[in-house]
Amino acid sequence: GDSLYGSHSPTVTSQLGSLCMAPALLMASYQPGVKIEERPLNRMQQTGVKPSLGEDKPKVPGILPFSVEALMADRKPGRDRDLSSPTGSPLAGTSHSPRVGSIAAGETPNSPISLGNRYPVGAIMQLPEETLLKPESPERSSWIQSPSFSPSPTRRMSPPACPLRKHKTNRKPRTPFTTSQLLALERKFRQKQYLSIAERAEFSSSLNLTETQVKIWFQNRRAKAKRLQEAELEKLKMAAKPMLPPAFGISFPLGTPVPTASLYGTSNPFQRQALPMSPMGLYTAHLGYSMYHLS
């Protein structure tokens, strides 16, 4: 007899091939993100062959996330669908009222609002006013009033403390020296600014003072003498500065006597006009002079 495949016509052979390809095409239709070409299914419909596996399961065409159909239908992929439900436990710190774009309590997941769209324009327009959070509602501004988001209050800049010199509370009172004691101390200081231990003990006993009082007085007197001497030297430096630049000088012809009138600025038709000058002896000073030196 003839073989199984040899006795059939080419039409029957193509029908059997379509039946073999049908399960693979149906399995590919369940893969997410894969769009099925309609050409093999059209061939099956034209030949009249109906797949046995496709009768009990509905056809779910997959849509790519960036395809034209997904953009026109305003959809997102299945993994980004809204997972929030009324029975789900809310996160800690979030409000229990429904937010804009979420599923309301009385709606089902199959409602037009919950088609995987978080913020569709049509769904927001169809929501009742009670589900929307108004700007003045306390639930909307609760996170703003929380201490973690509220800015810290500006600290007032306290005025800087006045740096006043505070004396110690246990400071000893100032020693009131008499006039005779001050004169004796000044006389002794002009003789000798530094006293030995024996001299200080003898001198303090003669003035009815303690050695510490005499020592402190001599220390203060030496500091005062140093300040006065520095002030005198500063005055001498200021007075010694010439009125003219150092490179500028007045020259006279050699062998001719210097007229006295030219030093004081008097006019002479045969001599140059001289600038007024003070006598040279005014600037001479004994820098080594000591004001406490006794002659």
From Swiss-Prot:
PROSITE patterns xref list: HOMEOBOX_1, HOMEOBOX_2
Location(s), subcellular: Nucleus
SUPFAM superfamilies from the UniProt entry: Homeodomain-like
Keyword Nucleus among UniProt keywords: yes
Pfam families attached to this UniProt entry: Homeodomain
Endpoints of the signal sequence: none
InterPro entries assigned to the protein according to its UniProt record, in alphabetical order: HD (IPR001356), HD_metazoa (IPR020479), Homeobox_CS (IPR017970), Homeodomain-like_sf (IPR009057), Msh_Homeobox_Regulators (IPR050674)
Keywords assigned: Developmental protein, DNA-binding, Homeobox, Nucleus
Extent of Polar residues compositional bias: 84-97
DNA-binding region extent: 170-229
Annotated region described as Disordered, given as residue ranges: 75-115, 134-175
Protein family per UniProt: Belongs to the Msh homeobox family.
Name recorded for this polypeptide: Homeobox protein XHOX-7.1
